[in-house]
């Protein structure tokens, strides 16, 4: 070997050895009483961790790192450059967290369990228990597809996620359909990604606690045909929301439902259609059932509310006149939408409409919406 080759080989061996000299980091480590988070960042000046369990009454968009009252736990660096901290084991749930390295928001590089909520990525901490019993463990799984369909109403090709239950491909049975609508700044993948929707469906159906059903999760952003999410231009956002929402609501009935009923083995009648959604999707649920009261027999908005303007009241009266099987709405008591949900409850009561107002502690969060979906599924198509 000549001198240049020897030098090149030596550099390669040095880099190879350096890479493997980096300490092995496992994170998170869940013990009996504490969870330990760790990250290799030898050049960092400060590393902290912020988790959703620190403020369960927060909203799903999270507390920005620059907020003066954000709760974080400071991590300490050892001589190998590994930062670590331990916190008490949170209650049973699927929690999310991020590290802040010198103020920069990052994932836990040692944790492969990552969620995407339409605007950001989050590392996941799953604490098993009663709350999470339907998030894992199923042995018979349904299938999910990302499906493109034509939407003449919105003038574009659009995409939706479709869940078919275990056994769909091997039988001739027709199924009822749940149309499951996402919230603001999310997309057609978010119900499955953030709420573990298909895992909950698999578990509930396998246990015989929910009817086997097809679940359709469309993209609810009229100016976007598929994930990833693109924000509306600021100058157009406020004036376009009502117009775009109305167009999307029309497209659900005129484009999405016909596509599903032409391409999947479904029972194509009101008694076998349900609609539910969270936040913006809850508003879409209220709007589509008011505009088309003869389409859905199961009406299940979450994390949203009503109002007393005449158009809204007229829509509620139309639903009552058309008839329905189940009106079930839900909100966390710390949700900023909770006052509006109380108004909706009052309006339904005043109109003599049989309904359920399901509440629990917590805010405008995925922790609540997962539980709401898990609670709702056994009530559908009974």
Feature map (PLM): residue ranges:
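Non-catalytic cap/lid and distal C-terminal segments of serine-dependent acyl enzymes
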Residues: 30-382
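Short beta-strand segments of immunoglobulin-like
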Residues: 25-28
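Bacterial Sec-dependent N-terminal signal peptides
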Residues: 1-23
């Amino acid at each position: 070997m000549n001198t240049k080759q020897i030098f090149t080989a030596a550099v390669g061996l040095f880099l190879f050895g350096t890479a493997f000299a980096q300490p092995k980091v496992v994170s998170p480590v869940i013990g009996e009483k504490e969870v330990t988070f760790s990250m290799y960042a030898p050049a960092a000046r400060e590393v902290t961790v912020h988790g959703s369990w620190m403020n369960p009454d927060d909203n799903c968009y999270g507390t920005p790192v620059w907020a003066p009252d954000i709760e974080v736990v400071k991590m300490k660096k050892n001589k190998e450059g590994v930062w670590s901290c331990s916190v008490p084991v949170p209650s049973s749930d699927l929690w999310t967290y991020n590290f802040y390295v010198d103020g920069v928001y990052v994932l836990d590089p040692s944790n492969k369990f990552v969620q995407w909520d339409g605007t950001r990525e989050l590392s996941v901490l799953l604490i098993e228990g009663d709350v999470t019993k339907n998030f894992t463990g199923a042995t018979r799984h349904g299938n999910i597809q990302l499906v493109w369909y034509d939407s003449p109403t919105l003038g574009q090709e659009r995409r939706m996620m479709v869940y078919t239950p275990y056994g769909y491909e091997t039988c001739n049975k027709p199924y009822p359909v749940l149309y499951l609508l996402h919230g603001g700044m999310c997309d057609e993948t978010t119900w499955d990604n953030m709420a573990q929707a298909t895992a909950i469906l698999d578990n509930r159906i396998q246990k015989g606690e929910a009817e086997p059903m097809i679940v359709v999760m469309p993209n609810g952003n009229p100016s976007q045909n598929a994930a990833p999410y693109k924000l509306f231009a600021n100058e157009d956002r406020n004036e376009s929301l009502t117009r775009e929402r109305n167009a999307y609501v029309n497209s659900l009935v005129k484009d999405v439902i016909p596509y599903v009923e032409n391409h999947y083995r479904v029972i194509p009648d009101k008694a076998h259609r349900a609609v539910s959604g969270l936040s913006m999707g809850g508003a879409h649920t209220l709007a589509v059932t008011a505009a088309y009261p003869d389409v859905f027999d199961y009406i299940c908005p979450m994390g949203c509310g009503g109002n007393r303007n005449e158009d809204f009241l007229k829509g509620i009266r139309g639903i009552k006149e058309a008839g329905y099987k189940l009106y079930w709405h839900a909100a966390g008591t710390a949700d900023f939408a909770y006052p509006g949900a109380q108004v909706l409850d009052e309006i339904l009561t005043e109109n003599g409409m049989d309904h359920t107002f399901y509440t629990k502690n917590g805010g405008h969060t995925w922790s609540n919406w997962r539980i709401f979906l898990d609670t709702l599924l056994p009530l559908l198509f009974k």
